[in-house]
């Protein structure tokens, strides 16, 4: 009687194994309907991430806000808690507040000079920094009530941004 029961169990296990073997040969593994995490799109510039307002950060398209992206791109950056917003520009993170001239930038602050631009002195100062050797950030102080302002460049690798009103600070993005 035990022998019959043992043969029945072995036969049952053999049939189950044959069914799994046959189903594996004729029915290949199917992809899941929804992946756990969607694949990240690689990019070099923001234009590569046109869809849904994404920006290129660290070589991948992401919806990361500008402040988080700056912290991701620039390891060890110390942002002043008063700085609560920034905007993406093609080559820079542009902050709504700026560095204090007495900050750790110290001697690295280079006064480029007074600029006259009736449209946007900030954009002009930014483009000058992008073409100035060693410039890692810029600041534009508009002279009250005029279309002129002072443009400053900075050369420190990890700026510690300090709060100050009526000026704009920007640091370069790591664009691949």
Curated annotation (Swiss-Prot):
Kindly state which keywords UniProt assigns to this record, in alphabetical order. Early protein, Host cell membrane, Host membrane, Membrane, Transmembrane, Transmembrane helix, Virion
The residues exposed to the Intravirion compartment are 1
The places in or outside the cell where this protein is found are:
Virion membrane; Host cell membrane
Question: What induces it, per record?
Answer: Early structural protein.
Membrane topology per record: Single-pass membrane protein
Q: One GO CC annotation, please? A: membrane
Taking the first listed entry, what is the main subcellular location of this protein, grouped into a coarse class?
Answer: virion
Decide whether keyword Transmembrane helix is in the record. Answer: yes
TM annotation in the entry: 2-22
Instruction: Give ranges for the Virion surface compartment.
Output: 23-176
Q: Does the keyword Membrane apply?
A: yes
**Top-level taxonomic group:** Viruses
* Coiled-coil intervals, chain numbering: none
Q: Which family does it belong to?
A: Belongs to the asfivirus envelope protein p22 family.
Quote the protein name from its UniProt record. Answer: Envelope protein 167
């Amino acid at each position: 009687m035990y022998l019959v029961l043992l043969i029945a169990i072995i036969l049952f296990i053999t049939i189950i194994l044959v069914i799994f073997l046959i189903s594996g040969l004729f029915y290949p593994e199917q992809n899941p309907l929804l992946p756990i995490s969607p694949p990240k799109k690689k990019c070099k510039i923001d234009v590569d991430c046109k869809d849904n307002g994404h920006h290129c950060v660290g070589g991948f398209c992401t919806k990361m806000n500008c402040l988080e992206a700056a912290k991701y791109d620039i390891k060890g950056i110390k942002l002043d808690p008063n700085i609560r917003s920034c905007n993406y520009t093609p080559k820079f993170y542009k902050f709504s507040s700026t560095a204090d001239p007495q900050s750790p930038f110290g001697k690295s602050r280079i006064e480029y000079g007074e600029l006259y631009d009736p449209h946007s002195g900030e954009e002009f100062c930014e483009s000058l920094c992008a073409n100035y050797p060693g410039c890692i950030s810029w600041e534009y102080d508009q002279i009250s009530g005029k279309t002129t302002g002072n443009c400053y460049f900075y050369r420190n690798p990890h700026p510690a941004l300090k709060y100050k009103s009526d000026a704009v600070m920007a640091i370069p993005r790591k664009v691949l």
